Curated annotation (Swiss-Prot):
Keywords: Cytoplasm, Initiation factor, Protein biosynthesis, Repeat, WD repeat. Component of the eukaryotic translation initiation factor 3 (eIF-3) complex, which is involved in protein synthesis of a specialized repertoire of mRNAs and, together with other initiation factors, stimulates binding of mRNA and methionyl-tRNAi to the 40S ribosome. The eIF-3 complex specifically targets and initiates translation of a subset of mRNAs involved in cell proliferation. SUPFAM superfamilies: WD40 repeat-like (SSF50978). This is Eukaryotic translation initiation factor 3 subunit I. GO terms for cellular component: eukaryotic 43S preinitiation complex; eukaryotic 48S preinitiation complex; eukaryotic translation initiation factor 3 complex, eIF3e; eukaryotic translation initiation factor 3 complex, eIF3m; nuclear periphery. It is found in: Cytoplasm. The gene is TIF34. Belongs to the eIF-3 subunit I family.
Length: 350
């Protein structure tokens, strides 16, 4: 599984994202320009320039018509993918940590960070897709979800199926489910900080199952990742790692999940990958066992995205590189005998 190595950013990657078809890969980093790449060969299609600082998040709508970015320069920008032109900018009261289009592309959520005296909010904007009036977007959000005064700030968020709920992860390890129409909190769950003794339990990523968005995976600095059902809001599986996790994704076709993270570079005495645990980790989604690791980055993995058709994945690291992997035959041939596994589990319990 020899990857394509993309060198298009001057600083650490913050997010990589495929479009729905998987032919394009979008990336943002702690520099001030987003990049768009052909995922098949790594050729750069273009850059989106306009932010004045770090870009924390990027997302693309289902039709690959519009793209949104959120940054530390207190701006949410809307771009036309075909031309690379910024068509609209929303001002934010604080740095924007995450942007995400609803599944139908009609709405855009953004997390305004809880800093600079701002209490921290999740805002939702209605998106006008009319080509003739893309620059005419509503400046006021259609929904504002405020973090409770005594609550922890939201760090990541995403949409459930049909845009019915907004799921957010917070820096106290809790996950919240909000009604996407009213903003009312429907449910909450302590997903992190209960599986290990780690003090830092910040939720670092949320990604949904591609097929129906009925469940999602989280990652956290507590060295764990959890699989959670949207409907019941119960933890289905827990994947334990040996380093803080920054990102997690669910693979289609095969029952695997991919985790990425590693010790912060300043805490590592050598640059060896094994020393800092800078590998992408593959776990069996059902049995929770680690089944393999992929090396390559010389620093923590900050972001992982799986190709929509399940044929590969991309990772972005603290080292400033993107690695685009295509799975080989051994990946698809790998399988675990469920009956044998259940026998092992029974023996362990006995």
């Amino acid at each position: 599984m020899r990857p394509i190595k993309l060198m298009g950013h001057e600083r650490s990657l913050t997010q990589v994202k495929y479009n729905r078809e998987g032919d394009l890969l979008f990336s943002v980093a702690k520099d001030n320009a987003a990049s768009i790449w052909y995922s098949s060969n790594g050729e750069r299609l273009g850059t989106l320039e306009g932010h004045q600082g770090v870009i924390w998040s990027i997302d693309v709508d289902p039709d690959t018509h519009l793209c949104a970015t959120g940054g530390g320069d207190l701006a949410i920008k809307l771009w036309k993918v075909e031309t690379g032109k910024c068509v609209f900018t929303w001002e934010s009261p604080s740095p924007v940590r995450r942007v995400a289009f609803s599944p139908d592309g009609s709405r855009l959520l953004a997390i305004a960070d809880q800093v600079m005296g701002h209490i921290g909010t999740i805002v939702v904007y209605e998106i006008n897709h009319d080509d003739e009036s893309l620059t005419n977007q509503s400046t006021e959000p259609s929904l504002v979800i405020e973090t409770p005064q005594d609550g922890a700030k939201a760090t990541v968020a995403g949409w459930s199926a049909n845009g019915e709920f907004i799921i957010s992860g917070h820096d106290d390890g809790y996950i919240y489910k909000y009604d996407a129409q009213t903003g009312e909190a429907v449910n909450s769950l302590e997903a992190h900080g209960i599986h290990t003794e780690e003090k830092n339990v910040t939720v670092t990523d949320i990604q949904f199952a591609a097929e129906d968005r009925s469940y999602f995976i989280t990652s956290s600095k507590d060295k764990c990742s959890t699989l959670i059902d949207v409907d019941t809001f119960e933890i289905l599986k827990v994947y334990k790692a040996d380093a803080p996790m920054n990102t997690a994704a669910i693979t289609p076709l095969k029952d695997f999940v991919i985790l990425g993270g590693g010790q912060e570079a300043r805490n590592v005495t050598t640059t060896a990958e094994s020393q800092g645990k800078f590998e992408a980790r593959f776990y069996h989604k059902v049995f929770e066992d680690e089944i393999g690791r992929v090396k390559g980055h010389f620093g923590p993995l900050n972001t992982v995205a799986v190709h929509p058709d399940g044929t590969g994945y991309s990772s972005g690291g603290e080292d400033g590189f993107i690695r685009v992997h295509t799975f080989d035959k051994s990946y698809f041939d790998f399988y675990v005998d469920a009956a044998e596994k259940n026998t092992e589990k029974s023996a362990e319990k006995a």
